Every structure is written in C-alpha cells, then in structure tokens.
Amino acid sequence: MTRIESTFEILKAQNKKALIPYVMAGDPNPSNFVGLLHDLVKHGADMIEVGLPFSDPMADGPTVALAGERALAAGTSTRDALKMVAEFRQQDTQTPIILMGYLNPVEIIGYDNFVALCEQSGVDGILMVDLPPAEAGSFTQHLTEHSMNEIFLLSPTTLPERREQVLTHCGGYIYYVSLKGVTGSATLDTDDVATQVQAIKAETDLPVCVGFGIRDAASAKAIGAHADGIIVGSALVQNFADIDGNDATAVAHAQQKIMAKMTELREALDSLSVSSNG
C-alpha cells in the first residue's frame, strides 16, 4: 500500500475529507519552500501537490503560471524540486507528496532516472498533465513497482474512451477537474460536480478529489460534501503574487495569509464530518 492509499484509508476511518494544497516548487523562493511545506501540514494538509516549474504550462491559469515563472526566475529546476522534497522527508515521513507537471522536463531527465530520483526523494505520486493514459503503460508500471501512484485528470469534457483509460490506469486518487478551463477560472457548479463525482464513484473504488475553483470555506464545504477530498491551488499561491520573493517580511506575511486560508478550509471540511456524525 502506498503512502497515498494508506492516508485515504486513515481519513476514511476517521470520516474525514482530504485537504490537498497545491504549491509551486521554489515559489516565492527556494530557501523558503521546505518550511512552507511543513507549515501546510501543521495547518491541516493531508497531502501536498507540488508543481514542477515549466516554461509552457498549457493547463495552468494565470495565477499558477505566474507562480511557475517566479520559480523559474529563482532558478528552480525539476531536480531542485526533488531535492526540496527529499529535505522535507527528513522531518516528515507521513505526508504524501504528489508532483504535478509536464512531460518535457521528465523526458530530459529520462523516465527511468526520473522515477529513481522520485523514489529516492520520497515522492508518492505523479500527475503529468500532458501524458495520455493510453500511452502511460510502462511509466505507470515503473511507478507502481516503486510504490508510487500515477494520477490522472478527469473533467466534464473528458471523452468516454479516455475516461475509461483514466479509470483503468489511475492510482491513488482521481483528480476531477470541476471547471471547463484552466486553473483558477470560472465559477463552480456544485450540483454538476456532485452529479459527476457520484458517476465516477459508481465506476471506481478510487477516492475522488476535486480541484479547480475551490477558493473558500463555502466552496470547500459544498464540494467536500460529495468528494473524498479537495485540491486548492490558485487561492493559496495568489498570495505570493506581486511580492519580492527575497523580502523576508513580505514572504512571511504572504505565508501567514496562506495558512489562514488553510485553517479556513480545514475547519470547513471538518465541519462535514461533525455534521455527518451528529
């Protein structure tokens, strides 16, 4: 059982929903990043998605794309991101880390080398936005052999053939994209998300987590009522926009705002388990 799988087992036994923050590796600066990960855990993260900076992030909305630009400007590479995860693992051996990114940097490193580096660093899951599930066979197998899960996206516009492939190859959890667009865009239709999540759950035993468009306690609670977890990115990383990543005071203030948001989201999700037990 992978760390992701065991975490969901524990959450299920506790009747809790997973809170999964997304942050960009090296944003706002590499020296702060490991501390940021630990703070996220202290403020309720059950697992963390770490973005790998890439120069052409086609699925990222402006907020996350700018986070990637800041990380790249600070000199953060995929190998640097893995070193940060390894440093995090020295003090935290429990919280799953999922890398989210694009294939090009992985292909430069080489698939086998990348998997080996991920295992050495303590990575638990991989989500490559531009890797079609039908073409992921050997990569998925290699990850599985090294106790990691490969995670895929499903969205309202996923075609039936691809949906079937995702449900066949996905591990850890299904990442359901709640909006038809890029990250951080549009507004949530919670009734539609509820219907879609129920349909996915009828086809798989994997947990279903919902991302894109969750920004506050109300949306967290509305989605958490139906999903096994929520993924929140833009609402967190937007706090690093327009600050100087080398200004320690500005960075600390931005992190305080992120942790306040984490507390808000955690309390919203936990209120669901209280109400369902009550």
Curated annotation (Swiss-Prot):
One of its GO terms (molecular function) is tryptophan synthase activity. The active site is at E49, D60. InterPro entries: Aldolase_TIM (IPR013785), RibuloseP-bd_barrel (IPR011060), Trp_synthase_alpha_AS (IPR018204), Trp_synthase_suA (IPR002028). Its EC number is 4.2.1.20. Keywords: Amino-acid biosynthesis, Aromatic amino acid biosynthesis, Lyase, Tryptophan biosynthesis. The keyword Amino-acid biosynthesis applies. PROSITE patterns: TRP_SYNTHASE_ALPHA. Pathway: Amino-acid biosynthesis; L-tryptophan biosynthesis; L-tryptophan from chorismate: step 5/5. The keyword Amino-acid biosynthesis applies. Signal peptide: none annotated. Belongs to the TrpA family. Tetramer of two alpha and two beta chains. The alpha subunit is responsible for the aldol cleavage of indoleglycerol phosphate to indole and glyceraldehyde 3-phosphate. This is Tryptophan synthase alpha chain. The lineage of its organism: Bacteria, Pseudomonadati, Pseudomonadota, Gammaproteobacteria, Moraxellales. The gene is trpA.
